[in-house]
């Protein structure tokens, strides 16, 4: 067995298959063996804590980085958190209405939507049926200063003013364009990479002992910051060009093959 390493895993497309969102048996077996070998295992996801899939509940992880670096836990203890300031939250909601852009806001404890937005689509209706959400308009004048979120997802519609919102995002946020009008918008200064680097510093683990596994453009900061980076076989957006190794797809035991190839199990 090699010396102890620290491993960071994206969720969607890396540990979980596409719908119905299952953990492949080979992945479960590989993670169990890696834990038995003494390696530290962390989830590093764009999802906020409230959006954690139940399919991962039976797997062992030493900690979690949620919301692209906005909440960091280890051994069930919160080590770091950062949310979007309330004034910026309110400005963002106002501009999303003005620019006719649909949005879903993600915090550590709840998912919000804007029932007063002029931008409504079947996509948003479907999401609200699948995921419990709170209408942001419930926050009236008295408690409007009490809400915040960590990141948000936007859905561009045919009449959305995309370029004006892009300019606003460039000033205040970081965003990832996932195609089909879907953007993932995150806080400036936090990312999967900053979350990972926080833990490396806290645990005094050198970069060369850090391994990262992902499949999408929002994994790129994490993959670039790791000592060893692994792109899944189903990776997109050209991220494999920046990785040490590309394994097979998530539903073809990509994690199992990668951990074996890297002599971690």
Regions found by a protein language model. Name each.
Residues 99-213, 217-225, 234:
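Conserved acidic, metal-coordinating active-site core of Asp-based
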Residues 225, 229-265:
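Asp-based, Mg2+/Mn2+-dependent phosphohydrolase catalytic module
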Residues 34, 45, 152, 223, ...:
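Residue-level signal for inorganic ion chemistry
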Residues 59-60, 68, 168-172, 225-226, ...:
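Short, structured coil segments at secondary-structure junctions
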Residues 26-122:
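Active-site phosphate-binding/coordination module
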Residues 50-54, 164, 195, 221-222, ...:
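Phosphate- and divalent-cation-binding pockets in alpha/beta enzyme and binding domains
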Residues 5-20:
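Asp-based phosphoryl-transfer active-site loop
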Residues 2, 39, 198-209, 262-265:
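Glycine-rich phosphate-binding loop signature in dinucleotide/nucleotide-binding domains
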